[in-house]
Each structure stands twice: as C-alpha cells, then as structure tokens.
Amino acid sequence: MRRLFTTLVILLVVLAAGMTALVVLINPNDFRAYMVRQVEMRTGYRLSLDGELRWHVWPQLSILSGNVSVSAPGAATPVINAENMRLDVKLWPLLSHKLEVKQVMLKGAVIRLTPDSEARLASPAPIAPTGPSVPEADTPWHFDINQVEVADSVLVFQRGNAPALNVRDINLTMRSDASRQVQVSLSSRFNRDQRDLSFSLDAVLDMQNYPQQVAADVSSISYQLQGAGLPAEGISGKGTIRGSYQRQPEKLTVNQFALSANNSQLNGALSATFGTVAEYVLTLQSEKLDLDALLGLAHATSSGDGGDKTVIAQPVFSHDQSPEPYQGLRNSIARVAVNAATLVYHGMTVKAFVLKGSNQRGKVSVTDFSGQIGEGHFAIPGTMDVYASPVVSIQPTLTALPLATLLPVFELPDGLDGKLSLQGRLSGNELSRQAFISQWRGSASVQVDQLRLSSLNIQQLIQQAVVRNNSSVRAPDDYSRYTDIQQMSGEATLNAGKLDVQSLSGQSAALTLEGDGQFDLPAQRCDINMNVRVKQGWKGDDQWVQVLQDTAIPLRLYGEFGNLNYQLQVDQGLRKRLQDEMKKRLSDWTEKNQPAAKAPATNP
C-alpha cells in the first residue's frame, strides 16, 4: 500500500513538473499571429489582441488576454469588442503542437450588428479567374474550438437607418461537436419604448451549411414582456420554435412555432425574405386569442355600470415616427392567414374568426374577415390602397349581430338591444374607431330584429299624454320599462360623423312607426322624428279607440344618447286626424245627398 501511494505521489510530481515545464517553455504569444491568421482565413474577420497573452494554470489551463476586438474588412467599428478573453485549452494536444481550445470566454463584450460594423470595400476589386485554391502553408499548429461563452455583454443591432436596438445582460453558452451541431443556452433582456423584454432559451443549431444557412431547433423558450401599453401583469409565456436563416438571398423561415402568451395559444409558421422589397408570409392558428390581454385593451364598460375603465399608459417612443404614412406597406409584400377558434376583443367574444389578406407594395386586399358573435355572423371584405383617396374601402355584411355587444366596442352608451343586420359600402382614410365615427363615408341598408329600447316606453308616453287630454279613453295601469319593436329597418348614410337614416319603419304587436333620424356620432347626439300609431292598450269609447288606433302621433326624440328628451304633438295629431275624418264624412254625405243630374232632352 505504501509503495502504491509513493508511486502516485511520484506520478503527480512528474505531471506537475511536466506541466510547469511545458508552460514555461511554450510562450502563449507564439499563438497570436496564428490565431489572427486562422480567424481571418475562416471568417474573413480580423482579430486584434491588445497586450501580452499569459498563462493561467489553476483550476484550468487557460490563456488570458486584455482587450479583444473582431472587425470586418473596412468597417468603421468592430463587430465584437470585449474587455478580456479567456481561452481554456487542453494540455495534452500542446505536446503535439496542437492548440485545442475547449472554451472561449468573453466578458463585458459589446457586439455590434450595425451598418458601421459591416464590411466595406475601398474600391472595386478585380475578379480573379477560377482555379484551384492555394493550399495553406504547412504549420506545426492546429486550432480547434469546442465551446464559446459570453457573459454580461451587450448586443447593438441595427438595420439600415432604423433605430438601434440594445440587447443587454447577454449570457450565452455554445457547445459544438464533430457533426457541427451547436448546443446554445441564451438569456438576455432589452428595453425599448418603456417596455422591457427578458427571455431565455435552449436550442440546437445545425451549422453544416454555415455560413450560407443555419437551422435552429429551439426546444424551450420563456419570456416576459412588461411596460407601457401592456397589462399590469405583463405578457409572459413559453414555447418552441423551429426555423432557419439563409444568407443569400437573405431569408428567415420559421417552419413551426408554438407559443403561449398569457391565456392565449399561438401556433403557425412565418417567413421573411429581405431585399429591396421585403416579403412576409404568416400563417397563424389559435384555440384562443385574447387581444385584450395581449394588447392591454381595457374592457369597455357601459354608462350605467358606474365602473371605471382600466387606464393603461401608452409608450413614449424613443425615436421619431416616420412622417410618411403606411411606409411599411409601401415597401413590402405580405400574405397573412389567421384562424382563431375564439378571439376576445374589448370584452367581445368572436367565434370561428378568420382573416385572410395580402399586400402588394401598398395595395392591400382582405378577402376574408369574418366570424361569429353570439348567434350572429359578420363578413367584412375590403381593400386598401395607400396611393388613393379614400385609402380604405369595405363591404360589410352583418347578420343578426347582438347590439348590446357591439355598442361598448365603439364606446357608445347602452340602452339598445336587438339583432343587427347590415349590408353596405363604407370608405375612409384611416383605420381607427375615432376615424370611423368622425371621417368615414358610405351607405348601408340596416335592419334590427327584436329591438328593445331600455328605459323608454313609447306606448306609455303616447297613451298617457292622450288620456290627460281626453276623458273618453283610458290607458293600462301598468307598463314595462322598455319598448319592444319586432322589426325596424331603414336606409343609412354616413358622412364624416353625421349618420342620416331615412325611410325608417318599424312594427310590433303594440305599435307601428315611420320616420327619419339624424345622428351626430362624435357628439353622441341625435334627432329622430317619427309618426307612431299605437294599436293596443286603448280602452273606453269605441269610436275614440278606433280613431286613436288609426292616428299617427308625431314623436320627436332628441338630445344626447344617454339622456334623451322627447316631444309629443298629441293635439296636433288628433286635430289633423279629426279634420281628415270630418272632411271624409262630409264628402261622403255630399255624394249621397247630391240630386241626380237630369238627362239631356232628345229631339224627336
């Protein structure tokens, strides 16, 4: 046992002595020129190492350096600039003149992917004739890297003249194998426009076709987005992504993604081809797509609820907005297909939602924008031409949509319920609720079935006004607090916030009405004039009851939507009805009592 222990001690001493001798005899600065040459030959980038290289023996044999930078040819700024670098090397390969790096560690690095860091040629260079490549000169050293680690670093990303994006607190680990499969573990965060996104992911990169193509399989990704314009709890989720990046032509493809976002689930694929005109393709499926939770939209509350809407601060953008409207549409081509089993928007639940459309450099066509709300259905195809005026044109077809659900979406007071059907053509220059109610124009045929006017009983207003002025008739003792109209229809014209409804007619078992109305949507005011015939509820003198059932009473409703005033012209209506009745009876009496005209005499 003592001999074995002595042997082990001797081996350790020999090993330590050999390592010490190797480190002493091999100068790490001998690798400087070789590493610079290898990096430039393999990547085209230029490696710069400031200061002396030095050994670090414990706990891992490493080469330490000072400031490190990697630059593209002719670039104004380096792509990578790090405070220090550590190369963890293997001991035994050094004996055979092979520098095998187990890990590259960069700390405090700044990575710039900006126009200033891109390669630039000083002048057009002649193109050499094709031929066999010149073999690399023999060298006693070989250079391999198995792992790269980046800690506490920053990435500056910028495309063209777009604002730069700073990605901070980067912690990245990359491990490669012989088949050029790279395992990646990354965590980072970035802040933009008062919004903070933190994320972490684990992925496998297929580098077999690098640099022309890189494929990625992200097995897990988790994220959290917080800040202005978002719900108080933010947006968070997990998922998986599978895709690839192609260098020439530059194209990003996500073959499949599955992400959760709060209580929403997103599945689909997308691709982006970058060039003079960018081209995007998106296919999205979702079992539930809650836009209220994703976009921080407050649920609209009715005027009678007395509740406050949730106020969500909007972000203050850190860069100037483009003065050219729809610039993104002008410079791109896109195709979009979205299917959601359930979509939530401003508290409104839409089933079987479908969106299909395309953009051809500013000319947008939406062939399908449809869904179900309650028992109703809507389909709103349309077009958008950013070079024309009006910009947007839609052809809505609504069938039996619940009014009580739609009114809060447009921030209109409650008080109406029924099933809205509409068909028409509308156009405008902006896509927003405010623009729709203040700038849009168009016309439509409108019909509302099972209409209910809450807190207003038209039959009660008319009958009680008549009873106060005529003791020959009576009215019911009890009334409901609403008016039910079986069906109401009209022709509507919208003109910059002014809604004019003509040929307005409605009927129910208790009454019929005809008239027209004007609505000021921005001011939320209206002025409606109707002639109403009350067919039920009259009691008393039969002749008076018959007269009242056949008499149209003028009724005017006017004022703010939530505080309507009314004006009844009962006397005028009855007086006109009695005058017409007297004229009719006088005419009938005259015809009956007029002497017969004598026949003309005939000549013999």
At which residue positions do the language-model features occur?
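Solvent-exposed loop/turn tips at the surfaces of repeat/solenoid architectures
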Residues: V68, V104, A109, V148-S153, ...
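Secondary-structure transition motifs
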Residues: V68-T173, F274-N331, L453-S480
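Elongated, acidic membrane-bridging lipid-handling scaffolds
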Residues: I127-Y223, F317-N359
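Amphipathic hydrophobic-ligand
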Residues: Y45-S48, A75-V89, N161-L172, N191-D202, ...
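Glycine-rich, small/hydroxylated-residue low-complexity segments
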Residues: V101, S185-S187, N191, D202-V204, ...
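Terminal hydrophobic membrane-targeting helix
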Residues: A16-D116, Y387, L555
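Extended terminal
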Residues: R2-L12, L53, R247, F257-L259, ...
